[in-house]
């Protein structure tokens, strides 16, 4: 059991290894837009230098703006027992299908689930845009769960022999067909349960902020006890704080922080 959990934790490092380079690109781009380092003339929005740096910065944000999709597609590389490339394709299609189901159910029965899908997908709304789909903001947690489900289906069904007249659906197509049916209840359960999970995460964040030394102890204990399993990412990811803000806020305000003389 422990070896399987460790294998899962190790599989998470495949997408994680994309972060260092992307972070360096974004950090350098923000630095090169700081007039304190390169001068006022080069940071003028109309200058060719500033425009090139902006273009490079936007490319650097690719990984951070698409983390759920990257985690979903990256996990089968370490978890699929065979044909890892085909498993990644099946996961990508199924992950997008799951998000489309969430969008359709939310738009149709949003009042039943207590989710307002007519609002814009902005911070605090509980919604996000994923590959052009307005869906629940399940972050990498939803991506990991869906990726795990579809990868398990791939491991079980990829080699299954079908009748000759259905041979065209054998392999990856068969996995995607079964996953399509599985994504319907998954989307339903996500709409039922995830809003409550979001409230729980917010409550835990509030506790860690306000509990002083006890909050620090709880956070550190949970992180350290999960390190042997490789699942400590679930703890420090959502809850690392910078002056009562998610650490992700630093990436959004990095430019203004660099320009500050304080």
Predicted regions and their residues:
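Hydrophobic, small-residue-rich membrane helices and short re-entrant helix-turn-helix hairpins
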Residues: 1-10, 158-177, 197-218
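Early transmembrane hairpin of solute transport permeases
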Residues: 2-163, 170
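Hydrophobic alpha-helical transmembrane segments
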Residues: 12, 135-142, 176, 180, ...
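Hydrophobic alpha-helical transmembrane segments in multi-pass membrane proteins
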Residues: 14, 18-26, 176-187, 191
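Interfacial/capping segments of alpha-helical transmembrane domains
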Residues: 21-50, 92-120, 192-220, 224-225, ...
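Generic amphipathic alpha-helical segments used as scaffolds and interaction surfaces in large
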Residues: 132, 136, 184, 188-191, ...
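Juxtamembrane interface elements at the cytosolic ends of transmembrane helices
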Residues: 148-165, 181, 189-201, 233-237
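Short, intrinsically disordered, charge-balanced linker/junction segments flanking boundaries
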Residues: 259-262
